[in-house]
A protein has these predicted regions:
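Metal-dependent amide/peptide-bond hydrolase catalytic core
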Residues: 1-102
């Protein structure tokens, strides 16, 4: 009686918002993907995606997230990885790194 409690959570792990720099890296990835016959890569709405470590430095350096494997059940005991996609993703990432360093 005559007591109260309040709890407040602060979201401190933001999704990576779009910047001119990371959109340029995405444009390069898009071209790499098209050149490899894998189709285009479009940005995903930051409000619909999860957070990433790069989110903390995205305002200070150009970067990209979401180059990893494909599967389902992310970050749960039921997580699966589609191993058939790995070679193509590794090749695409390697070509992206090569082109970014030319």
């Amino acid at each position: 009686p005559q007591t109260s409690a309040r709890i407040r959570f602060t979201d401190s792990y933001p999704a990576m918002g779009p910047t001119e720099g990371n959109l340029a890296v995405l444009a390069e990835l898009d071209q790499v993907s098209k050149d490899m016959g894998q189709g285009g890569v479009a940005p995903y709405d930051p409000l619909k995606r999860g957070a990433a470590d790069i989110s903390f430095v995205a305002d200070y350096t150009d970067g990209i997230d979401g180059l990893g494997t494909m599967g389902s059940g992310a970050h749960t005991p039921q997580e699966t990885v589609n191993l058939k996609t790995m070679n193509a993703l590794i090749q695409r990432s390697a070509l992206l790194i090569y082109r970014l360093t030319r």
